[in-house]
Amino acid sequence: MLRHFKYQQTMKILILNGANLNLQGKRDRGVYGCESFDEFIPRLQQKYADLTIDYCQTNIEGEIVTALHQAEGKYDGVLLNAGGYTHTSVVIRDAIAAIDTPVVEIHISNIAAREDFRHTTLIGSVAIGSIVGFGLNSYILGVEALKLHLQ
């Protein structure tokens, strides 16, 4: 009798944060909340101990592009909060479009309920979806979205 074994690899997710997100917990607390990523990421990794969740933050647009390129083949999915680059960066949009790795657009605040210039997202049209407005819980919802997408 033949036995079939399903090889199950641990899902790997990259959380990639852009400009000013190094100030999370300090900047505009009324909009973004008080918890820093130094506090949140270990809590997220503990909640999803069955997954590998790596974290990267940069204020430099080109480094976001490079991280997206390097995610190809290394990660099963990316949660991307590009910060203000969401509204302006054609090169980040093009980097997402150029890779096969699924990307979920994440925003801590509800960008549709903020200033007019924040309503436009260049990234949303090439991401598999967008999760906005749930505070840091947007990242938890993003992990769940990637898990469902990759099933």
Cite the ranges covered by each PLM segment.
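Short glycine-rich anion-binding loops that position phosphate/pyrophosphate groups of nucleotides
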Residues: 19-21, 83-86, 109-111
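Glycine- and acidic-residue-enriched helix-capping/strand-helix junction motifs
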Residues: 23-38
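Short beta->alpha junction loops
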Residues: 54-62
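Short, glycine-/small-residue-rich phosphate/pyrophosphate-handling segment
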Residues: 54-55, 104, 113-151
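Short acidic active-site motifs
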Residues: 63-67
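Short acidic/histidine-rich motifs immediately flanking catalytic phosphotransfer sites
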Residues: 71-78
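Short Gly/Thr/Asp-enriched flexible loops that form oxyanion-binding sites at enzyme active sites
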Residues: 89-100
